[in-house]
Swiss-Prot record:
Keywords carried by this UniProt record: Actin capping, Actin-binding, Cytoplasm, Cytoskeleton
GO cellular component: actin cortical patch; cellular bud tip; cortical cytoskeleton; F-actin capping protein complex; incipient cellular bud site; mitotic actomyosin contractile ring
Keyword Cytoplasm: yes
Similarity comment: Belongs to the F-actin-capping protein alpha subunit family.
Predominant location: cytoplasm
Subcellular locations according to the entry: Cytoplasm, Cytoskeleton
Short name of one Pfam family: F-actin_cap_A
GO MF entries: actin filament binding
Designated name of the protein: F-actin-capping protein subunit alpha
InterPro entries: CapZ_alpha, CapZ_alpha/beta, CapZ_alpha/beta_2, CapZ_alpha_1, F-actin_cap_asu_CS
Length: 280
């Protein structure tokens, strides 16, 4: 079965961990040097932009997704800082920044307060690189996107926590995604997804019992905090269960010989003991 270059490049980029897009892009550019450079670079950049729009990424602590794409240009909107910007996809940099003015006036009365509380929430609970945005999709609908990302290529690991919440008067729903990649002398990747819906009994929070949710920043952030804490506990419990049960059963048990080791003068008779004695 044959596969063309376009399909191969797109497949490799779409399967890349979110914190490694720059490295994947550079590797693909090096591997495809024998082809038409301009067309290949354009293909790589188009694939990365498609990845960003569908999966949501952050560059320089700014969110990039299909949700904050400007309808009238090729740029994206940074609602938190009121900026329009382009992206150098291959080098993963924000470029061509200009001021943005929201002429649609979809932001509610609590918008600035919500920005402030989410910023404080990130400082309190995210020790890694933190990015967020609040997208006013209509007068009675907000989208909150949060990304916590850590990349340590020297120690062979990257990871991203991504939360995407849709907030309406009826409640809050969304998803939490975790993507961790460890690649020292191997290739191990963990992907986790948790759906959030305030209307479900299991996720129903006391912070959402009264009305006027869309204009109450404190209740929105408190709900997000509760759900993310609960998800973190769930992940830790699953890790412990995996380690104590599934992985433990894979370990090779040592045979029980019931023989005693003489830790006195006879220790030199054992291979390890003789090696230690001879090296003195």
């Amino acid at each position: 079965m044959s596969i063309n270059l376009n399909e191969l490049v797109d497949s490799l980029i779409q399967s890349a961990p979110p914190a490694e897009l720059k490295q994947v892009s550079q590797s693909l550019s090096s591997l495809t040097k024998g082809t038409s450079t301009s067309s290949t670079n354009s293909l790589i950049q188009d694939s990365i932009e498609q990845y960003a729009q569908e999966n949501i990424i952050s560059i320089d602590n700014i969110i990039i997704s299909k949700y904050n794409k400007d309808e009238n240009s090729s740029k994206y909107i940074d609602y938190v800082n009121n900026k329009l910007f382009n992206v150098d996809w291959q080098n993963q940099k924000i470029i061509d920044v200009e001021s943005y003015h929201d002429n649609n006036n979809k932001r509610g009365s609590n918008y600035d307060e919500l920005i402030q509380k989410l910023s404080q929430y990130g400082d309190d609970y995210y020790p890694s690189n933190f990015a967020f945005t609040v997208i006013p999709e209509s007068e009675d609908q907000l989208r909150v996107i949060i990304i916590g990302q850590r990349a340590n290529h020297d120690n062979f690991y990257t990871g991203q926590w991504k939360s995407n919440y849709l907030i309406t008067e009826q409640g809050i729903k969304g998803n939490i995604d975790l993507d961790i990649h460890y690649f020292e002398d191997g290739n191990v990747r963990l992907k986790f997804n948790e759906s959030i819906n305030s209307s479900n009994n299991n996720n129903n929070s006391s912070t959402l019992q009264s009305g006027n949710l869309i204009n109450n920043a404190s209740r929105i952030v408190n709900f997000i905090n509760e759900q993310e804490n609960a998800t973190m506990v769930k992940i830790i419990e699953q890790f412990n269960n995996l380690n104590q049960k599934s992985f433990k059963n894979l370990r090779r048990l040592l045979p029980v010989t019931r023989s005693k080791i003489n830790w006195g003068s006879a220790i030199g008779n054992y291979r390890l003991g003789s090696d230690v004695i001879n090296k003195k």
